[in-house]
Amino acid sequence: MTFRNRVGLTSAGGCCCPTLMTINQNVINNDINSPCGATSPYNFDAVVANRASVNPLGFGTRNISVISPASPTYTPTIDDYTGVYLRYNGNPITRPRNYLGNNFLNGGAENIADRTFNNNCNLASRFTNNDLRGYRAVDPNGRMRMYPPVFCDRPCDPCNPYSQSDIPYASELPYGATIPTQLDYPYGAGSIYSRGSQCNIAPVPSIYNYGPPTTFDPYNGNVQAIPIGPYGTTEPNICNPGAYRPDLFYPDRYRMDPNRLDNPRTYWNRLYC
């Protein structure tokens, strides 16, 4: 499989398993087509205010999937093309399309956080002030569950993390285990490296995008070995999704739980569990 500089998400082999997901703030080198939704043409050569990403002029008109929202009260417009595809770049110069009159440099971005996602593919995206922290899975009851940001071309088994990624869930790691990460100075637009060799992607794109470094990069871009724990062995998994709590995953957006903030890096657990 070829990833090139693809931006966004594609689904290979069926809707349940997005095995070809990459995240990158570069240009889209090919059409983004998903078997889970209709596609509509979009002219990436429109004025900057309407550009879908940092795509160069001359990129032309491409098909972008228009996907169904899980919220029955929310109706996407052609402007929405959904947040699953990276129209997001916190850089004010290359900021993306406006969303219902709000750009992603203000609180209006939160409108898209839980509404613009692919219900058919069981994927959701969360955006916090230009910060693309990761993709979430949605179980049939609408409860959220984090997946690792790397998906390999393997059969889809939502209860077996290794069918999804070389990077294990925190629930699969003993306390003290580390996941090496590379956060590029200054905004953390770096890479997360796969632990194994089953993925032919190294390095894989990170789940970080441009934005205020204090939003998502408390380590100022340093290379870190981020510990998983101390709750790494007891994290909920997709087979027990009821324990998912967004206030734990986004302590800056919801109330803080002191029981989960004993380690300033425990937010990393929210990424993998």
From Swiss-Prot:
Keywords (A to Z) from UniProt: Virion
UniProt protein name: Uncharacterized protein R646
Broad class of where this protein is predominantly found: virion
Organism: Acanthamoeba polyphaga mimivirus (APMV)
Top-level taxon of origin: Viruses
Taxon lineage: Viruses, Varidnaviria, Bamfordvirae, Nucleocytoviricota, Megaviricetes
Subcellular compartments: Virion
Any Gene Ontology CC annotation: virion component
